[in-house]
A protein has these predicted regions:
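Alpha-helical multi-pass membrane segments and their bilayer interfacial helix-loop junctions
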Residues: 2-584
Length: 584
């Protein structure tokens, strides 16, 4: 049996009184013992008060057991799931009514569509604040809509493909509006993902791709707008990828033989080209708005998607309108390239955003190359690209913009390939003698020489930039060598009847002269790439002696070629040292 404080104190006092013979001593001991008990009681009471907030913080408010909390949460999950299942049960009732024909099927279909959208609206109510409930109710809406549209379109034939596509479009817009107004993310996640997948599935099943591609383009437009307003997400990636797949399927199916798509409806050129071009316009316009107006950084997904959309647009034009469509697309590329360069200089380069600068620089160069190639004939294209290369290298060197120097190199290489300058140079130096070079080849060679003369190697450059200087130097060297060989052969034709051995000796002389000149000039002007080309030319001459002079030449001409090569081997290192001394 437990004793109270007063009983314990009384018994202690009695025992003390009983043991003490002097009453005054007993009173003193009793008083001290009572003081000690009061201090202990005070310490215990204040210790419990200090521990109470800690205990409340750890275990919750008083009167609430910790094992009751999971029961409360679990009790909220099961009613939500039950309500969702009730919604699915209602959908089955509507399905039974549609199959029984007791009511007009169109009326039942309209009620079913409204029923699915009502669940989407219910998921966005302010009272439904739990994320789990929003997910369940939005999922219930998608579970009702997807099979309902599938059966009403394919089984009952109540809806045409265009009607089903229109319903999906309204559903997508409703989800976007609810997300925008009430900021309920699960509504737009589930609503748009389900709408995109249902559109792709119905397009494949009905063979009517255009209506459902239109829905997918609407979804892409909605998400591009949401992304510009700072509300993008992973659902945007899903929607865009599904749209890419649908447009690629359209191009793949209709680019094949006609007998392989007998079940598909006939489509005109605009319907076949339009989806890819619209997707490219949507992605490109949104990308430009985000970068130029909102000053955002381009994401990796946006950069890759822009390339994919451009590839789809080009594929559609090349398959279904290779002539007139290519010219229109080329003009559009040139207009966009001009705007891209203006934006690059006025807005992007001053901001020093490296990724935006790289992406816009790549797009500017790519659009320029594509526009020139699709719009102009080969001779005019080569001339324009050569002139553009010279302009780019001059501006890039003066303003110290390495990206423009790279663009100039790309334009120069493209001009050389269009004019077939590398092929002509190889034939002149190692193959069969070709006819006299045309104006286009001469212009390409002159552009290569001027480009290399205008370029400037900076001290301490890394090897990628050194390669950028080496390529125009190679083009200039081989263009000069080919033109010199052609000129010497023309002069020699006045004196002798040219044979293979004459051609081999003239080629050897020209290459040795180019090697010696580049060796001295490279060390004299501090152009390391010229010195490298000088030694590379010696290796080329050695291979030429083995495969041409020794096989087709006469003894005296072989001796002359070997003499020239040996002399060049001796002279080139000395010229390098001589040029270095002159430079100092």
């Amino acid at each position: 049996m437990w004793l109270t404080k007063s009983q314990f104190a009384a018994r202690s006092a009695v025992s003390l009184v009983g043991t003490m013979k002097d009453p005054s001593d007993a009173l003193e001991l009793l008083s001290s013992r009572v003081d000690q008990l009061e201090k202990r009681v005070y310490a215990l009471e204040h210790a419990s008060e200090a521990a109470a907030p800690v205990q409340e913080k750890l275990f919750g408010p008083a009167g609430l057991a910790t094992d009751e909390i999971p029961e409360v949460e679990a009790s909220g999950v099961f009613p939500v799931l039950g309500k969702g299942l009730l919604g699915v049960a209602g959908a089955y009732i509507l399905r039974a009514l549609a199959e029984s024909s007791s009511l007009p099927r169109s009326a039942v279909a309209a009620v079913a569509v409204a029923y699915a959208m009502a669940w989407l609206v219910w998921a966005s109510r302010p009272k439904v604040s739990a994320r789990f409930a929003q997910l369940v109710y939005s999922g219930t809406s998608a579970v009702i809509l997807a099979p309902m549209l599938w059966e009403l379109t394919l089984h009952f034939k109540t809806f045409s493909p265009w009607t089903s596509a229109g319903i999906l479009g309204v559903y997508a817009v409703l989800a976007a509006l609810l997300f925008w107004k009430r900021d309920v993310a699960p509504v737009v996640w589930i609503g748009h993902c389900s709408a995109a997948l249902v559109a792709l599935s119905l397009g494949i099943a009905t063979h009517a791709l255009i209506p459902f591609i239109a829905v997918l383009l609407l979804l892409v437009s909605l998400w591009e707008y949401l992304a510009m307003r700072g509300r993008g997400g992973a659902t945007r990636h899903v929607v865009v990828l599904v749209c890419d797949v649908a447009i690629w399927g359209l191009i793949f199916i209709y680019s094949g033989p006609a007998n392989a798509r007998a079940d598909y409806p006939h489509l005109g050129m605009a319907a076949l080209i339009g989806p890819g071009c619209l997707l490219w316009a949507i992605n490109g316009g949104a990308l430009a708005g985000e970068v130029l107006c909102l000053r955002k950084t381009i994401s990796v997904f946006e950069a890759i998607q822009a390339v994919a959309a451009f590839a789809l647009a080009v594929s559609g034009v090349q398959y279904f309108a290779p002539n007139s469509g290519a010219v229109v697309l080329g003009i559009a590329c040139l207009i966009l390239a001009s705007g891209s360069y203006v934006a690059l200089f006025l807005r992007i380069l001053p901001s020093e955003n490296r990724r935006n600068r790289t992406v816009f620089g790549f797009w500017s160069a790519a659009l320029t190359l594509a526009g020139v190639a699709w719009t102009l004939p080969p001779a005019a294209a080569a001339a324009c690209l050569g002139a553009g290369a010279l302009v780019a290298i001059v501006i890039g060197v003066r303003r110290d913009i390495a990206m423009l120097e790279l663009h100039g190199l790309l334009f120069l290489v493209a001009a050389a390939l269009i004019s077939k300058a590398p092929e002509y140079a190889f034939e002149e130096l190692a193959g069969s003698v070709v006819a006299k070079p045309g104006l286009m080849l001469i212009a390409a060679g002159v552009c290569s020489v001027l480009f290399y003369a205008a370029s400037k190697e900076r001290p301490g450059e890394r090897w990628p930039l050194q390669i950028l200087h080496l390529i125009p130097a190679l083009l200039a060297a081989f263009a000069l060598a080919a033109l010199i060989v052609q000129g010497l052969l023309g002069l020699a034709a006045f004196a002798v009847n040219l044979g293979v051995h004459h051609v081999a000796l003239i080629r050897t002389f020209t290459l040795c002269a180019i090697s010696a000149a580049f060796a001295f000039g490279g060390s004299r002007w501090g152009r390391l790439e010229m010195t490298r080309i000088a030694y590379a030319t010696l290796a080329f001459v050695a291979a030429k002696l083995l495969f041409e002079d020794l096989r087709h030449g006469r003894m005296e001409f072989i001796a002359g070629s070997i003499f020239l090569f040996a002399l060049t081997l001796i002279v080139v290192p000395r010229l390098v040292r001589m040029g270095a001394r002159v430079q100092r």
